[in-house]
Structures are given as C-alpha cells and as structure tokens.
C-alpha cells in the first residue's frame, strides 16, 4: 500500500486581481484630501434668552429613578460661552433693520412676488387639469 502524505493544515487562500477590460477599477486610491475645522466659534450674547432652566424633580429623582447631579446643561457654559439652557433665537433683535415696517422691494418687488406666486399656482393647476379626466 502506498503511503500518501495528507496534511490537515488548510491551504493558503489567495485571490488574484485581474483587470477586466471595459470595467472601472473598484480599488480605492490614496488621496491627500483632508478636512480641517477653522476653529472654535463661541456664541456671544449680550443678554440671556428664555428661562434659567432650573430643575425641580419630585423626590429629587428623574423619570428613570436616578438622583440628579446638579450639572445639567450648565457644564457646557464655559465650552460654548452662551446661555445654553435658554431660548436662543436665530435672529437677534440687534440685527433687525430699523426700517422693518416698510418692505424694501417697494411696489415693484411686491408685483414681481405676486406674479411669481400666481404663475406657480397656475402652473400647478394646469398640471392637475392636464392629468385629470377633465382634459379628455
């Protein structure tokens, strides 16, 4: 009987990369693209907005049954430099135009706005009419 050598070790598995004509390569190339933040921008508020956000919990525990540590959002005041627990509007009253009672575009701007609105509504009505049974 002839003895054959059998090994229980797995053979190394390798896949050869072959380029197929007509297909783009899916291999990623290294690039030098890098995203970097410009720096920390702190919010400046002259006056606080909203209420102070003090917590008064029943029996001193929150909804999950844990005692409050007293930190809340106040731990981020130094980091963000603003009243983090209050209402912070997008528009500040200091930035508003002093002549805000009058539309800057005038009657010409209002006419252009009205014609644009009527055109959009008429176009939508025309599309609905053309795709309905009434158009037949």
UniProtKB/Swiss-Prot annotation:
Q: Which GO terms describe its biological process?
A: photosynthesis
Q: Name one Pfam family in it.
A: PsbR
Q: Does the keyword Thylakoid apply?
A: yes
Give the UniProt entry's GO cellular component terms.
chloroplast thylakoid membrane; photosystem II oxygen evolving complex
Q: Which UniProt keywords apply?
A: Chloroplast, Membrane, Photosynthesis, Photosystem II, Plastid, Thylakoid, Transit peptide
Q: Indicate the residues annotated as transit peptide.
A: 1-37
Please tell me whether the keyword Lyase is annotated for this protein.
no
Main location (coarse class)? plastid
Entry superkingdom: Eukaryota
**Localization annotation:** Plastid, Chloroplast thylakoid membrane
Q: Which family does it belong to?
A: Belongs to the psbR family.
Q: Per its database record, what is this protein's job? A: Associated with the oxygen-evolving complex of photosystem II.
Q: Which PANTHER family does the record cross-reference, listed alphabetically?
A: PHOTOSYSTEM II 10 KDA POLYPEPTIDE, CHLOROPLASTIC
Listed name of the protein? Photosystem II 10 kDa polypeptide, chloroplastic
């Amino acid at each position: 009987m002839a003895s054959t050598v059998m090994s229980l070790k797995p053979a190394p598995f390798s896949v050869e990369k072959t380029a197929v004509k007509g297909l783009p390569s899916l291999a990623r190339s290294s690039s030098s693209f890098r995203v970097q933040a410009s720096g920390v921008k702190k919010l400046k508020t002259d006056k606080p907005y909203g209420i102070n956000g003090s917590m008064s919990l029943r029996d001193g525990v929150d909804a999950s049954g844990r005692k409050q540590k007293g930190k809340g959002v106040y731990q981020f005041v130094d980091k963000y430099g603003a009243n983090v627990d209050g209402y912070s509007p997008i528009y500040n009253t200091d930035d508003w135009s002093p002549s805000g009672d009058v539309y800057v575009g005038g009657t010409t701007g209002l006419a252009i706005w009205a014609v644009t609105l009527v055109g959009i509504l008429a176009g939508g009505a025309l599309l609905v009419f053309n795709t309905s049974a009434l158009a037949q």
